[in-house]
Amino acid sequence: MSAKFNVKTFQGMILALQDYWAQQGCTIVQPFDMEVGAGTSHPMTALRALGPEPMAFAYVQPSRRPTDGRYGENPNRLQHYYQFQVVIKPSPDNIQELYLGSLKMLGFDPTQHDIRFVEDNWENPTLGAWGLGWEVWLNGMEVTQFTYFQQVGGLECKPVTGEVTYGLERLAMYIQGVDSVYDLVYSDGPLGKTTYGDVFHQNEVEQSTYNFEYADVDFLFECFNKYEQEAKFLLKQEPRMENDKEIWVETALPLPAYERILKAAHSFNLLDARKAISVTERQRYILRIRALTKGVAEAYYASREALGFPGCK
């Protein structure tokens, strides 16, 4: 178990994971500052998985899934939660051993606990991504997803990126032995204990109310369309009209375009929470996002290729 950090707090567990993966050679980057549904959507994973350039990153990512909100009344369902993401390319042969080492560091002796890798291949339709994967079950509870990326944005991942995604709240609930996420000890210092509920319960209540009851449907449809238009403009797929003139970007800008796509995707997720999209419409919207993501993947790969894939040097 980590001696540096109190892993029986949510804060200490995160610090211990960051320290452990930094010691394995990962660069610890910061959370992406936009609404995403999972740590995979962080550009350090979604885009850096493309092309031959090696990488090793780890980070915490706040994730939003509006339809999962329960007004703060469910002990383990949240519309806003945290993942810890590790991505290494090319995936090292011993990545599973490294992961088991992180569990041991958190106090789980593999000889004393039932740790199982259950096959569960992963797919993200909006990212046009899929991979071979496993859920990791710790004493009967899923705590981690392992994925070996095969495609992102419809492009083949060569070499393969290994991804490890920890469900931080679930892992912490197991370590602390609590049945409600809101009872987790977030920190315990000179000023006393702070619980997860102290920090986030009101946000869950209010954001659930907004997501399900008050998010402006007409505004969100308009947002989706505008973000889609802006992404296409930034990818040189269509012009923008300014003062009755067509304006084109000189060179595709995949990183800003990707941010517009994430905004469109979050607008879509809010519309989904408001039940404003039918089943058939839902598929059409997913395909629209997927088409944009494919454009970003191709433009990003081309931009790195034009630079001579500098990370390979």
Swiss-Prot record:
Catalytic function, reaction form: tRNA(Gly) + glycine + ATP = glycyl-tRNA(Gly) + AMP + diphosphate
GO cellular component: cytosol
Family annotation (Pfam families): tRNA-synt_2e (PF02091)
Main location: cytoplasm
The keyword Protein transport is assigned to this record: no
SUPFAM superfamilies attached to this UniProt entry: Class II aaRS and biotin synthetases
EC number: 6.1.1.14
CDD domains, sorted: GlyRS_alpha_core
Keywords, comma-separated and alphabetical: Aminoacyl-tRNA synthetase, ATP-binding, Cytoplasm, Ligase, Nucleotide-binding, Protein biosynthesis
Entry's localization field: Cytoplasm
Record flagged with keyword Hydrolase: no
Biological process, per Gene Ontology: glycyl-tRNA aminoacylation
PROSITE patterns associated with the record: AA_TRNA_LIGASE_II_GLYAB (PS50861)
Domain of life: Bacteria
GO MF annotation list: ATP binding; glycine-tRNA ligase activity
PANTHER family: GLYCINE--TRNA LIGASE, CHLOROPLASTIC_MITOCHONDRIAL 2 (PTHR30075:SF2), GLYCYL-TRNA SYNTHETASE (PTHR30075)
Subunit-level organization: Tetramer of two alpha and two beta subunits.
HAMAP family per the UniProt record, alphabetical: Gly_tRNA_synth_alpha (MF_00254)
Family statement drawn from the similarity comment of this UniProt entry: Belongs to the class-II aminoacyl-tRNA synthetase family.
Protein name, entry field: Glycine--tRNA ligase alpha subunit
Annotated source species: Mannheimia succiniciproducens (strain KCTC 0769BP / MBEL55E)
Upper lineage: Bacteria, Pseudomonadati, Pseudomonadota, Gammaproteobacteria, Pasteurellales
Gene: glyQ
